[in-house]
């Protein structure tokens, strides 16, 4: 009859007895269309009134629930195990979501919780003993890095995070906060690469906070990258001079160290930082560690620059990502930007002194908007412009734009027709920036072999890494050569180039070199040095002891 349902209605299941006895509406477990059923009374008669236009939820029979659930689980697991594509897609999804390869829960390694707690202790010690201050603003970056490391250790899903780099150099700190010097640009590029490869990077300021970090997680530390003077302090620290050394490092107090006062690993202090894990940042070509060039990190490939083919470990840097943000202009200012940070560069070691003005005046004017515009040379050397727009006067009629922020300088470079070197600064990143934005570089040749003047292997130039790069990208001019400089300026002013990034400045290559630094067995390499170079002399065994001592 209308408004009621019989027990034979296949679309109706009774509520459980406890529901009827409760005498109130209960939401059943199953979704069954757009009606639901309520008892008309609590008299025990199973007579239901259909209420329409309201969603109907129906509770299936209790005995069928466990069976249905079990069946569903079996079917799901059977399908997942038997279909590789399903497994692959699930793994891909997890990898995509997490950014790292997930490990199953049953693969949790014993001791991960203990290791995570040790990292927590380290974080607490650093925050208490070496907090982030105005003088050490990058230390607060460590807290997030350590939290990330703790999380992956606890869940046993670390990839490269468990491989730690300690950076004890003002250039890492300067690069992190936007420093524009050559060393800072290099360090920032290294830091970006280390992070992109998912290694853990920790900032330190001196040899004692570096030692504290190392001693808490020695097996995780793959490399300690030092500033030369800090490495020297670590080596020198002993029971008689430690107080004097600490006096020079106000932000790296070492009073926490009890017992023997030391920093570097030795037979008397085996818990110290190993030589073979210690690498030194060095902008120039000479090795600065007892283990030689492979433990001296350099921004340029000196094995290809030096006449004898000797070199340090080339890490290099890449400005590829950042310079690609800037436009390559078809129309440029009819001017050349002189590469010089300080006014003194125009008087000290200026290889074009006295001829810059003459060479400038020899460049033909450009026609812009129907008018002839003379070629000019400009510079950003010196102080910022005063309120009235004045700044230092520069020789030979060179226009001073005044010191400017990095972004503004880069735009000025991008709109120039050439970048002109006069001798200093050496190995600056600016020529690379210019080439990447389509601006050629005039590279001054400061020295050459008189009997073989065209042999570039024996040239000494302002930017030696570019001395093999040909025109129209790089114009090489001998110092004091007015004709050569005039001709180079004219060709550069009238020959447009597109973006040019040397192969060794590519990001992909730099990442591979950072991987090599992090993945090489440097203990084995150091043992070879001790055996071959030092002939296993006992006094050099501390460079790579027979017992590694880093676990």
List where the protein language model places each region.
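Conserved catalytic-core segment of nucleotide-activated headgroup transferases in glycan assembly
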Residues: 177-183, 307-410
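Catalytic binding pocket for nucleotide-activated donors in carbohydrate/polymer assembly enzymes
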Residues: 417-516, 531
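N-terminal pre-catalytic "stem/leader" segment of glycosyltransferase-like enzymes
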Residues: 37, 60-64, 78-235, 516-551
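Short alpha-helical donor nucleotide-sugar binding micro-motif in glycosyltransferases
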Residues: 412-416
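Short acidic, S/G/P-rich loop/turn micro-motifs used as interaction or catalytic elements
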Residues: 171-182, 209-210, 229-236, 240-241, ...
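Catalytic core of nucleotide-activated saccharide and alditol-phosphate transferases
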Residues: 219-350
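N-terminal signal-anchor transmembrane helix specifying type II single-pass membrane topology
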Residues: 15, 19, 23-101
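Well-ordered, non-membrane alpha-helical segments in soluble/globular domains
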Residues: 180-190, 348-366, 483-490, 511-520
């Amino acid at each position: 009859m209308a408004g009621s349902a019989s027990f034979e209605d296949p679309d109706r299941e009774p509520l459980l007895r406890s529901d009827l006895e409760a005498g109130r509406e209960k939401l059943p477990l199953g979704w069954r269309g757009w009606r639901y059923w309520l008892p008309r009374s609590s008299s025990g008669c199973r007579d239901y009134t259909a209420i329409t236009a309201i969603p109907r939820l129906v509770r299936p029979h209790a005995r069928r629930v466990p069976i249905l659930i079990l069946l569903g689980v079996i079917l799901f697991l059977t399908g997942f195990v038997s279909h590789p594509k399903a497994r692959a897609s699930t793994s891909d999804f997890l990898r995509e979501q997490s950014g790292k390869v997930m490990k199953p829960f049953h693969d949790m390694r014993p001791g991960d919780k203990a290791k995570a707690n040790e990292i927590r202790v380290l974080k607490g010690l650093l925050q208490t003993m070496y907090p982030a201050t105005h003088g050490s603003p990058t230390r607060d970056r460590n807290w997030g890095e350590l939290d990330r490391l703790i999380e992956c250790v606890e869940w046993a899903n670390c990839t490269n995070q468990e491989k730690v780099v300690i950076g004890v150099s003002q250039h890492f700190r300067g690069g992190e906060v936007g420093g524009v010097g050559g060393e800072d640009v290099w360090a920032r590029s290294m830091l970006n690469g280390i992070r992109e490869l998912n290694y853990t990077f920790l900032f330190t300021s001196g040899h004692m906070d570096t030692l504290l970090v190392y001693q808490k997680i020695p097996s995780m530390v793959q490399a300690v990258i030092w500033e030369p003077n800090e490495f020297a302090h670590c080596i020198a620290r002993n029971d008689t001079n430690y107080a004097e050394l600490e006096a020079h490092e106000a932000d790296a107090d070492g009073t926490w160290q009890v017992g023997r006062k030391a920093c570097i690993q030795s037979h008397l202090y085996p818990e110290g930082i190993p030589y073979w894990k210690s690498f030194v940042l060095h902008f120039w070509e000479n090795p600065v560690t007892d283990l030689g060039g492979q433990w001296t990190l350099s921004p340029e490939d000196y094995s290809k620059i030096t006449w004898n083919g000797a070199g340090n470990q080339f890490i290099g840097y890449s400005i590829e990502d950042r310079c690609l943000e800037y436009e390559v202009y078809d129309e440029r200012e009819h001017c050349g930007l002189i590469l010089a940070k300080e006014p003194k560069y125009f008087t000290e070691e200026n290889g074009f002194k006295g001829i810059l003005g003459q060479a400038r005046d020899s460049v033909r004017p450009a026609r812009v908007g129907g008018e002839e515009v003379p070629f000019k040379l400009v510079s950003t050397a010196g102080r910022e412009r005063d309120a009235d727009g004045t700044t230092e006067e520069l020789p030979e009629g060179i226009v001073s734009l005044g010191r400017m922020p990095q972004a503004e300088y880069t735009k000025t470079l991008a709109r120039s027709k050439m970048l002109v070197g006069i001798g200093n600064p050496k190995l600056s990143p600016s020529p690379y920036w210019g080439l990447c934005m389509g601006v050629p570089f005039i590279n001054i040749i400061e020295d050459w072999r008189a009997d073989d003047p065209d042999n570039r292997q024996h040239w000494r130039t302002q930017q030696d890494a570019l001395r093999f790069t040909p025109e129209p990208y790089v114009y090489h001019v001998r110092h004091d050569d007015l004709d050569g400089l005039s001709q180079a300026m004219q060709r550069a002013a009238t020959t447009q180039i597109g973006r040019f990034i040397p192969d060794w400045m590519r990001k992909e290559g730099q990442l591979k070199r950072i991987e090599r630094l992090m993945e090489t067995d440097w203990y084995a390499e150091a043992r070879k040095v001790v055996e071959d170079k030092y002939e296993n002399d006992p006094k050099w065994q501390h460079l790579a002891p027979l017992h590694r001592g880093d676990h």
